[in-house]
From Swiss-Prot:
Gene3D superfamilies: HAD superfamily/HAD-like. GO terms for biological process: defense response; response to jasmonic acid. One of its GO terms (molecular function) is acid phosphatase activity. It comes from Arabidopsis thaliana (Mouse-ear cress). Glycans are attached at N115, N215. This is Vegetative storage protein 1. The lineage of its organism: Eukaryota, Viridiplantae, Streptophyta, Embryophyta, Tracheophyta. GO terms for cellular component: plant-type vacuole.
Length: 270
């Protein structure tokens, strides 16, 4: 009989969150005995109906923010308490957001702005200026699947979202520097009325443009926002900076420096 090493047993325990009744013992033994366990892990786990678990949620979060962990549908179930603590209890989310926004302000303050054009800063909306935490708190802080479009329906029903104070401070400081905000969101245009009301309620009352996605558009967030930015540049705007909570907000033909805010709740493909 082959003896499985303790280290491999611990590795399996750290990477498998639950075993469905269809999972086969030979398949698991194959995974444990494999000399290339990490190469075979994802394929075998998928085949056996298992899901990957992350024993260190702080490390998982780092992987998300650095775009090393991508294409996840939900937060790992075992990381619910970590995400709640990060966003609510420990205030670390606020501290991290403050650091990003402070650096954005220092960068903007040091710019030599052009006098012959309109200098603008691109803001994302959800989880940049406004927070979706109240919504995702109802669904296990991102650990539970929600139906496509459920968040938009929630907003359309009249629910408002709180402002994110650190980004709101940046918004105010940029206005004082003479840099005008342009808000680009992947919210449907049919949500413009509730969006404007929500923005005004948190103190965002001035913007050069508030651009929402055409109803029913099939463009990905990356393509949509890239097209909007290119259109703004062609109109003569000088984009000096960009801030958002997803890399999808910030990649592909992005003039000016980009600043990535933390968000462990969900992932938008980039």
């Amino acid at each position: 009989m082959k003896i499985l090493s303790l280290s491999l047993l611990l590795l399996l325990a750290a990477t498998v969150s639950h075993v469905q009744s269809s999972a086969s013992v030979p398949g698991l033994i194959e995974l444990l005995e494999s000399n290339t366990i990490f190469g075979n892990e994802a394929e075998l786990l998928e085949k056996e109906g298992l899901s990957i678990n992350y024993p260190n949620c702080r490390s998982w979060h780092l992987g998300v923010e650095t775009s090393n962990i991508i294409n996840f549908d939900t937060v790992p179930a075992n990381c619910k308490a970590y995400v709640e603590d990060y966003l609510i209890t420990s205030k670390q989310y606020q501290y991290d957001s403050k650091t990003v926004n402070k650096e954005a302000y220092f960068y903007a303050k040091g710019l030599a702005l052009k006098n012959d054009t309109v200098n603008v800063w691109i803001f994302d909306l959800d989880d940049t200026l406004l927070s979706s935490i109240p919504y995702y708190a109802k669904y296990g802080y991102g650990t539970e699947n929600t139906a496509p479009g459920a968040y938009w329906s929630w907003l359309e029903s009249g629910e408002s979202t709180p402002g994110l104070p650190e980004t709101l401070h940046l918004y105010e400081n940029l206005l004082e520097l003479g840099i005008e905000p342009i808000i680009i969101s992947d919210r449907w245009k049919k949500l413009s009325e509730v969006t404007v009301e929500n923005l005004k309620a948190v103190g965002v009352t001035k913007w050069k443009h508030l651009i929402l996605k055409p109803n029913g558009s099939k463009l990905t967030q990356v393509v949509y926002k890239s097209k909007v930015r290119n259109s703004l540049v062609k109109k003569g705007y000088n984009i000096v900076g960009n801030i958002g909570d997803q890399w999808a907000d910030l990649v592909e033909d992005t003039p000016g420096r980009v600043f990535k805010l933390p968000n462990p709740l969900y992932y938008v493909p980039s």
